[in-house]
Amino acid sequence: RNHATYLRQESDPEKVELLWKVRRNVSKAVKALAKYRVSEDVAVPNSKIPETVAFVSELNRSSRLRINCWGHAGDGNIHINVMAMSDAPEEMAEIEPLLERAMRKILELGGTLTGEHGIGLAKKRYLGLEFDRPTLAAMARIKTTFDPDFRFNPGKLFPDYLFST
């Protein structure tokens, strides 16, 4: 129904373990392909997975960098990887615009900017794409209610402007 090209289900314990071994090593194998990699997890409705994969494929074709994705089809979680073959300034400068294009597309498809790893330092700059300023301000007020001294994960979720006077 979602145009899968291959599906494998196993009941043999040895074959199940082999599939898990492949799954556990995908990230390491992809990381070994490049000198520098940024991996972002996002989530989209399951019906939008094919469109997400097609978009990532198009990004890959349009860039000198390598871009790929894999994920957990059951919950729509997709890991998007942008990889530079060197640390040349022109390659490094291309990473951020590609990631922002991907984040905007994920939101356009009805997805969310984080699938399983949270916002943290890496994605807080994108929060304004998903949430408007009043929503972010409300979230910041909730945080300050429970953490008025900013002791828990300081600076890791919200843009600093939400706490300036």
Language-model segments: which ranges?
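Alpha-helix capping/hinge segments and adjacent helical runs
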Residues: L107-I119, T144, P148-F152
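Short, intrinsically disordered/low-complexity patches at protein termini
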Residues: K31, A102-R104, E116, A138, ...
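A structural signal for short, well-ordered beta-strand segments
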Residues: E40, I78-V82, H117, K123, ...
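Alpha-helical scaffold segments in soluble metabolic enzymes
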Residues: F55, R101, A137, R141
